[in-house]
Amino acid sequence: MSGAEEAGGGGPAAGPAGSVPAGVGVGAGAGAGVGVGAGPGAAAGPAAAAALGEAAGPGLPDEAGLAGARQLQEAAGDPDAPPKKRLRAAEAAEAAAAAAAAGSGKLEERLYSVLCCTVCLDLPKASVYQCTNGHLMCAGCFIHLLADARLKEEQATCPNCRCEISKSLCCRNLAVEKAVSELPSECGFCLCQFPRSILERHQKEECQDRVTQCKYKRIGCPWHGPFHELTVHEAACAHPTKTGNELMEILDEMDQSHRKEMQLYNSIFSLLSFEKIGYTEVQFRPYRTDDFITRLYYETPRFTVLNQTWVLKARVNDSERNPNLSCKRTLSFQLLLKSKVTAPLECSFLLLKGPYDDVKISPVIYHFVFTNESNETDYVPLPIVDSVECNKLLAAKNINLRLFLFQIQK
């Protein structure tokens, strides 16, 4: 709680001018501070007065500001006070002003806890829903609550007040959505603060530190760097001066990469023609192992796809001992079949980003034959673009992805 809140919205009003010691003037009105006039210690007055005025903000000074003012008045009003005492008093007054300013906290920090989702405790990225009592849920958590209730054959309830929730009982809260879109968020490239509503455009089009590519990448230039260095690089790029034979070798490599990409998408289109296809949104939740040195892992609640019950697990850097000491971060996952099957179940599966997240995942198709004896796949890499995207996932309260399952029938 801030000093202003502890004082009940502000300290008492300043008394008559005659009650103030000689050489000290108390300013009235907004941002009232304490200024030192003539007499010893006057040099310390303006800085402390400005600091105290900022700490107090609009209205009257709070308790911390008044305490600093009293210390400054005592030292300034006593002509016999030693210079060291006057200096210490001035420093104490400025420290009290700084503490009062820090105690109040930024508005956006206080709003964060007010507007966050009651389930994942994170700020919503898309739609915001509320129960009949006004508790907020982001779209991803709202859908998960409904899906979990369907699997348990129960009525979905608000995790706060336990009132019933459904798509017909809950409504969107546009005011909260707009308020969240105006809250400041930090650009991952330049570390500046921008409203969340324009942050994506800033990172893609305006940020001078955003990662960009050379315009000669089509003829093989591999350069990646900040946008403000692009002009200098392109002026010195050697690829435009290469001979035709050199460029043909580069273009052959690019054609091979293009063929692999086309092969992947053709495989996905082929899977989409299968008779039995299932997909669902999955939510990886963080847990800790029971080891002496605990390790982070993720696991989803049980879900049903293709009339079978499944679970997904994930781990960081293949459960290495100290992943926090590594600059490279990776996630790997495995799919577990929890149902009993009467015959081998051959499936292809892949993970993609969920509908309410912006993580960058490249599609990779995995294949496995599930039986009662072999009911879990090996850990396979989650195809995240880079360590930056992995850190974004690890920083979130939960990881929301979409799983596709294709049953191969012989």
Swiss-Prot record:
Keywords: Cytoplasm, Metal-binding, Zinc, Zinc-finger. GO terms for molecular function: zinc ion binding. Residues 1-13 have a biased composition (Gly residues). A zinc finger (TRAF-type) spans 158-231. Signal peptide: none annotated. The keyword Cytoplasm applies. Interacts with LGALS3. Belongs to the ZFTRAF1 family. This is Zinc finger TRAF-type-containing protein 1. It comes from Bos taurus (Bovine).
